[in-house]
Amino acid sequence: MEIKEISTAALKEKIEADEELYLIDVREDEEVAEGMIPQAVHIRMGDIPEKMETLDKDKEYVFICRSGMRSMNVCKYLDEQGFKTVNVEGGMMAWEGETKPKN
């Protein structure tokens, strides 16, 4: 199954256009402490299996990590469970928009 991907530029456009977006950052606590996209929700990759029951299979979720590898693995896993997923190409390393420290 081919996983959909979005560039950081296209993601930034969606955020700036105030489009409805379900963005999940799957990095570790110490990584998001350095800054995350303000519109993102933080769910560590290791917590995804137990948290997936809180996700809605009718919604499309966009996943981001540091480089795009972990988020791709999360996308593949959730895709197999019947979720609609999109991976952010290049992850936070490619992101040039605003970030904020996680509270």
Swiss-Prot record:
SUPFAM superfamilies, alphabetized: Rhodanese/Cell cycle control phosphatase
Active-site feature positions: C65
A Pfam match: Rhodanese
Cited InterPro entries: GlpE_sulfurtransferase, Rhodanese-like_dom, Rhodanese-like_dom_sf
GO MF: transferase activity
Protein name: Putative sulfurtransferase YtwF
Documented EC number(s): 2.8.1.-
Keywords: Transferase
Top-rank taxon: Bacteria
Domain Rhodanese as annotated: residue spans: 17-100
Organism: Bacillus subtilis (strain 168)
